[in-house]
């Protein structure tokens, strides 16, 4: 087969061109995303009930939903959180379960649970988590003229954003929807003239009745007139402020208009939440990308639209923040840059080792064609370009060059021994094809168990496994197809291989001269090598225990989310003022910030729900160091000025965090009452104080308390003074501007018409207030009694019922010690019990699973090697080197301060598949030489000399191909850093072991049988 190829160079060239054309066409159509598009096994149920407290939401709504939803199949965990005005149920399912069936089942169970609710309650909103839930970016719209920013202009800007900006954004084909928050809405406030009403013997209820009666709609009525039928319409509706003012009513025998008895004015509704960007009140829009849209196209269209907005609306300021496309571009560009640098380093290595200019040119031809063929396979197998698949390409690049080096080196050796060039090209390629195929299979075998990892991690790294497999197969095809043909064409006019005179002077090939002497030294002092082997066996377990276990490596970021719960009943204006006060402390450190205070209006769950006393501040700094400094100093400033506040910081959300739930706290202690009842505030406060005393080095936040005023009526006095409960409720609603008469439709929203007498202070709500009855005016303070209570602001519950979640930010051995201390203190109190969850446990489960993957991978390698060598002994010789290699990897991780995480473990697994390739070639060569009659020791020395240059070259090219990932700075490089560190340290140790330890082990085993 290979002989026919060398004689048909034009046919081979045409095949290459066809592959490149198809591959380039496939690249243009491949989707580009940050991570692979996979299903996320999460469903959220959002409950809304504006008039209910957190306790009522939990007891009356979430408890019934929870009892139904815990029965859903494949449920992994359920967390219910109740707060004033609503609640959220987050369900996580086993990966691989039928998401469509589960979604239908959840809807049916929600309908079953809500059948007993009050008819006025809204049906809960159910949403499936998706990779597109993370906005591509946020757009802040604010007024440029801050000095003349008034309530009217802000209302106009809000209406303009809702009516115009969002619709123009949603018209883009790449945009699925625009989620918006920070909107301001108007209302009509009717302030009755109570003196006039009392003078004519009426109250404010007469005004509300008149307005409701004036807003009449007959509905669908028609009347017949001869042969025709006409619709009947009744023109009596209230749609403007003037309509309300001109409503007629009859009181005390006279007719009045509303404007005669009350003042009607249009004003802004009471703020429940607010957003400011760099000190300006703004409207924020989250742009959600369609799942099949390309990020680059979306960014280009948005940039064009932003330029048009700034030109058409000069009074408005448009700002793009939290740009996921920037993260994608930066990560992808760095990955591509690292890929190119890796290829360049590989060519430099070949340039110096092969000592001429033509051999690197062969590799330069092979690498691009193999990469383009790989992208063609990507397109066929529906694999996107993302940081995972690109990292697989980079891993495969080093091994891709290995095949080319081995083929070129073997052809050159046979040619130098006197074989004709064509025969050297044909038989040199044919000789190494079988061991190269075995190397590809062993490497692919390493990745097969990664595909079967449970959960999202297995699905995510399917792309990496497939990318490496595709790259290796493509490289093998191109190596045997291209190199013999073009090698023959490049050198056919030369009698033999002649190194370039200039390069041979600076060649590193002279380093091989001392190989025989070093190997002979190890043969004489075999105890040194066996001592290293024994020490590695003993110390692997010690290093494994000492290394911290994490799910993911620490990813650098230049932005953050600062979460604050003030733990005080402050108004939204004070909340915003405090946020601005914090940001004023960092004038030169922060590039931009967006403060979201109070409740937000987003429909999707990309931004967590917040209450009136909570704030989320997004901060973008110039560098990783600046953001670390900001987080540290901001926390200190908040602690000094507002000691009751609870605060935390986290990286700004991206799809990678969403997939791996990296925001999960290290340890969460779920403290609950032994009898299942609600924890008493005083008991919980005392318990947390004891924990702070016992764990001074651990930050234990204050409980988030919700203080409220409780009004208790006196039924006996209500009956005595002939006052109904509805009268008291109506008065309180009017006093707090909460008595809604009707809602006027304004298209996509409705404007409430409210009757009120102006908001009152809490101290004036009862004292000095009266209710008019038929018997006269009754002081409200003799009918009501006021008390103040407190309860948890957020009430958490799960499968085991209600609990208090205590977050402990501790890692490693400190986590185990902290849990022992907490358990001892909590269980000493007969009222409480505790259980634990958090990333501390999930990380260890994942590491155990990866260790199982490593064992399975080594077993697969053993089976493949045993089949290849037809021996049960030689696989042990090759695989024994993994002991020293794994010890070297763990030692380097420990010295560099890295943890044992998903990426470092995958690097270790991949290293096991790559590092034995050199040993496979060496053992195969030793076997061939022994079959030709060489003695054992001579065969070992000869095989070492023949393969030394190829082994060093392949190791160096693999190491240098992934060396660019040792430079951190973006998410892609940070993610690949521990993988690269593990792979490089393993390859360095593996090269030493392949060159010196494997020949020694081969000699020790076969010296007795050698004749």
Task: Label the predicted regions.
Residues 179-183, 191, 260-263, 274-348, ...:
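Juxtamembrane "pre-transmembrane" interface segments
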Residues 56-133, 195-216, 237, 574-663, ...:
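Solvent-exposed, membrane-proximal periplasmic/extracellular interface segments of envelope transport
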Residues 1-32, 432, 500-553, 669, ...:
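Signature of alpha-helical transmembrane segments and their immediate interfacial
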Residues 79-84, 158-283, 287-288, 675, ...:
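Beta-strand-rich non-transmembrane domains
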Residues 2-9, 291, 296, 329-386, ...:
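Interfacial segments of transmembrane alpha-helices in multi-pass membrane proteins
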Residues 312, 328, 332-336, 353-355, ...:
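Cytosolic juxtamembrane regions of multi-pass inner-membrane proteins
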Residues 10, 17-53, 111-120, 379, ...:
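Transmembrane helices with small-residue packing motifs
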Residues 324, 641-1009:
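C-terminal transmembrane helical bundles of large multi-pass transporters
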